[in-house]
């Protein structure tokens, strides 16, 4: 502007207008999303802490917790114990019903104990895994997952640490966390919470 001597982006007005249009169109969706997160068990800012994967840690226990099928998704959480905390080292969160893919993924994740929460349909798979893995246990499917999720949420916030690097590098790790944060008692998307609460329930009961 020759009068004010201010400079402007060439298409600044258009981009500003576009932002206003997007904000107006997406306002209701964002409000619903925001309110859903606020009501979530983990909705508070800073609910989760992180560990530094670049640091060498001495782990006293290594667990892989598996739920082979929740709403058509296969979930796996690899958690290593460091002192009183548990590092969520890796996560599998994918849409698959392939038994071979599930078995292969489980075998690729190191642990001293593998826990499979499943119905009896998956017992043959568990028996097969026992032939090649150190220790494989079966956990029965929990009848009231919402109660378990609520009962373990404080423990999860206090003792489970996330990997910031994994969040950046792994789409599945990020999708798992998004599912975790989107949970409420009426939602259909409970896969991540079912799996993490199952792991927490086992740790509280047998590893505390």
Regions found by a protein language model. Give the residues of each.
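RNase H-like, metal-dependent nuclease domains and their acidic two-metal-ion catalytic environment used
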Residues: 1-137, 163-208
């Amino acid at each position: 502007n020759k009068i004010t001597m201010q400079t402007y982006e060439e298409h600044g007005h258009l981009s500003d207008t576009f932002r206003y249009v997007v904000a107006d169109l997406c306002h209701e969706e964002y409000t619903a999303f925001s309110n859903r997160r606020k009501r979530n068990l983990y909705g508070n800012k800073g609910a989760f802490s992180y560990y530094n994967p670049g640091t060498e840690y001495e782990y006293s226990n290594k667990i892989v917790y598996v739920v082979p099928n929740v709403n058509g998704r296969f979930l796996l959480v690899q958690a290593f114990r460091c002192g009183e905390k548990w590092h969520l080292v890796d996560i599998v969160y994918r849409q698959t019903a392939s038994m071979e893919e599930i078995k292969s993924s489980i075998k690729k994740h190191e642990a001293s104990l593998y826990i499979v929460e499943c119905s009896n349909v998956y017992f043959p798979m568990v028996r097969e895994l026992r032939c090649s893995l150190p220790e494989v246990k079966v956990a029965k499917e929990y009848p009231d997952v919402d109660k378990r999720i609520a009962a373990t949420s404080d423990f999860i916030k206090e003792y489970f640490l996330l990997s910031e690097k994994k969040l950046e590098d792994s789409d599945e790790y990020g999708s798992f966390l998004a599912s975790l944060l989107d949970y409420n008692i009426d939602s259909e998307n409970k896969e991540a919470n079912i799996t993490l609460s199952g792991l927490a329930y086992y740790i509280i009961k047998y590893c505390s």
